[in-house]
Amino acid sequence: MQNPFTLTFGKSPLEPIERPLQTMEIVDTFTAETVNQQMFIITGVQGSGKTVMMTEIARRLREREDWVVIELNPATDLLQGMLAKLNSNKVCAAIIKSAKIDLSFFGFGVAIEGVPPLTDTETAIITILEKLKKQDKRLLITIDEVTNNDYMKVFAGSFQIFVRQDLPVFLLATGLYENIDELQNEKNLTFLFRAPKIQLKPLNQQAVMNKYKNIFQIDQDVAKQMAELTRGYPFAFQVLGYLTWNHSGHYEAVIDEYEQYLSEFVYDKIWSELSQKDRIVARGIAETESGKIKEIREHLGMETNEFNPYRKRLMKKGIVSGETRGYVFFTLPLFERYVIDNS
């Protein structure tokens, strides 16, 4: 039997653990008869399941007859890419043809006699979206791992225009906290502040335990030990499952390899992107077993007003949880050991 787990980022595994509440929140909002929100941004650390969740939502909407779904590459000209995707989509291509929309200027189709060609990308997209609206169809655009580049700035400005013109276009994007924060602080793009952000938190521990128990046919105590080793971090769930599968279900035999995978695939990158002060605070958290903020500050010799900005930033990055008042803990499994070994 094939290994049901995967080590590939963004690939939907054979044995996923879904996030039903957050998934349904987005699907229900986008499909509501009266539209009051046309954009969601999914954030979280690398390996938290952002792409998998976005893919699942896109799949659900693609199955509906009144939806067109396209995916855009954030590293390329997004408006040009959007027009090309609309032109190559069967539903939109039929609309373009029947409405006699001349896109020959962009290299799509042939010139239509008696019809002036459209020469502005944004105008061409608006024309197609207006026809989609008349046919009671909606368009979902997905963009994975948005970054603050010129293509994204132009696209975000155009998307704002589409929404203002009451066009049936919806955006679902994923991104790391720092990239989203950088983008929404751009002049003229502050509307992104108002877009709902869904920060992916750890998976339900019971769900992780049940998954391991059923796949490996192990007793509850062993499944619980495995689940605790992952802390609900989706990539860790996949890595531990993958390695355990390859070792005939013996998870104790793979713990060193498991830790190495987490370090090389994720933690090295996370650590490299932290500032020196972030790292000092992270070390303080790692060295304070109780997790009490007061004890961490005393250990570091930092006042509250000096400590809090770094605590909040680590929380927004998804590295630290502050759900229990007065305490902070790492959300990532074995990250304490990594921090101490690397600082």
Residue spans of the language-model regions?
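Short regulatory helix/loop adjacent to the ATP-binding pocket of P-loop NTPases
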Residues: E178-A195
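Amphipathic alpha-helical "lid/sensor" segments that cap RecA-like P-loop NTPase cores
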Residues: F216-Y267
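Conserved small helical "lid"/interfacial subdomain of P-loop NTPases
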Residues: A195-V222
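C-terminal leucine-rich, beta-strand-based interaction scaffolds used for sensing/assembly
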Residues: Q2-P4, S263-S343
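A short, basic N-terminal segment
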Residues: M1-F40, L334-F335, D341
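Conserved catalytic segments around the Walker B and adjacent sensor/switch elements
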Residues: F40, T55, R59-D77
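Walker A/P-loop nucleotide-binding motif
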Residues: V35-E56
